[in-house]
Amino acid sequence: MEPPPAPGPERLFDSHRLPSDGFLLLALLLYAPVGLCLLVLRLFLGLHVFLVSCALPDSVLRRFVVRTMCAVLGLVARQEDSGLRDHRVRVLISNHVTPFDHNIVNLLTTCSTPLLNSPPSFVCWSRGFMEMDRRVELVESLKKFCASTRLPPTPLLLFPEEEATNGREGLLRFSSWPFSIQDVVQPLTLQVQRPLVSVTVSDASWVSELLWSLFVPFTVYQVRWLHPIRRQLGEENEEFALRVQQLVAKELGQIGTRLTPADKAEHMKRQRHPRLRPQSVQSSFPSPPSPSSDVQLTILAQRVKEVLPHVPLNVIQRDLARTGCVDLTITNLLEGAVAFMPEDVTEGSQSLPTASAPKFPSSGLVTPQPTALTFAKSSWARQESLQERKQALYEYARRRFRERQAQEAE
């Protein structure tokens, strides 16, 4: 039985906070006056929680008091299988759902989390992050931190995904640097539930996430501890990260994907891309004047067909009508986002890039040559090779389209 296909970025990230269901939207409107009152009240209570957490030293008493006060704020922290927690392990690995995951885990056990891509500041400290130096020195600093002999030892809580997801469908690819710190890590799973609205939105700031957390009746964070995992003999950091990712995904009932934070940024960019309107044409590839939008669509589809001759014309037209952009259509066809039955390419048609020279040398652009077709030893390496080939095909198809446009303009 084949494994289920990995979910795309549109299933890993929520773009809308409000529910689409009419009944839930009505319930949210009725709850709004109560939620606003709770928000104002909890803002004042939250200030007291912050002062208490700063005044009390790190201890079991402090965690109990702050955890109780956070429950009043609507942030409920629960844990399962706490007996599996090994206090000798210095690196904790978790999936990432909200900007406050590290605060919730810190209510259950002592831990420190570095803030990536941000300089040390008061905001960094007030949010409960560990202040570190530049990203270049991060790994070495964390290794020294874990190697310290201070008692009791403070473990590191790291999020290898580096970006938050909606916590429902799958996990982002785990970065390898958290697994280069020590040879033993203890993973944990984090599930977040919240009524009426989405738990997190892809382009929201931590301030807006905090306000929504104080607005809703409650947000439940469920932490489940897993057994510590040791690096196998000769196992690379990437393979270690992939093994832990698959274990965490299995415990969550989700799928470990190969998507990265860069894919999230690209997905957000596509969401902001304007759709095709009847009276407008795309700015990237100007179309010749035509009497109707249908004729324009046919002309653009025919040009894409010349670049990708194995794709049926009706498939190209359908995706162009949906995206309104040649760039996105070529990307979807090359990445397999659009299902189709390939057509037989005639002998006179051009194929995709090979080791031969490009047909249009006058453009001054160098066509990337695909790498040798070797079968990598690890699944991670095979996936990386596939991504490189897909990117090369995409750039080649895009370049051919531009060159045909330039020739017709001349």
From Swiss-Prot:
| Chain intervals for the UniProt region annotation (Disordered) | 259-293, 348-367
Its recorded name reads Lipid droplet-regulating VLDL assembly factor AUP1
Entry superkingdom: Eukaryota
Q: Name one GO biological process term.
A: protein localization to lipid droplet
Gene symbol?
Aup1
Originating species: Rattus norvegicus
- What range(s) does the CUE domain occupy? 296-338
* Assembly, per entry: Identified in a complex that contains SEL1L, OS9, FAF2/UBXD8, UBE2J1/UBC6E and AUP1. Interacts with the cytoplasmic tail of ITGA2B, ITGA1, ITGA2, ITGA5, ITGAV and ITGAM. Interacts (via C-terminus) with UBE2G2; the interaction recruits UBE2G2 to lipid droplets. Interacts with ubiquitin ligases AMFR/gp78 and RNF139/TRC8; this promotes interaction of UBE2G2 with AMFR and RNF139. Interacts with apolipoprotein APOB.
Q: How does it sit in the membrane?
A: Peripheral membrane protein
Q: GO cellular component terms?
A: autophagosome; endoplasmic reticulum; endoplasmic reticulum membrane; lipid droplet
Topology Cytoplasmic: residue spans: 1-20, 42-410
PTM annotation (N-acetylmethionine): residues: 1
Task: State its role.
Answer: Plays a role in the translocation of terminally misfolded proteins from the endoplasmic reticulum lumen to the cytoplasm and their degradation by the proteasome. Plays a role in lipid droplet formation. Induces lipid droplet clustering. Recruits ubiquitin-conjugating enzyme UBE2G2 to lipid droplets which facilitates its interaction with ubiquitin ligases AMFR/gp78 and RNF139/TRC8, leading to sterol-induced ubiquitination of HMGCR and its subsequent proteasomal degradation. Also required for the degradation of INSIG1, SREBF1 and SREBF2.
* Homology family: Belongs to the AUP1 family.
**Compartments it resides in:** Endoplasmic reticulum membrane; Lipid droplet
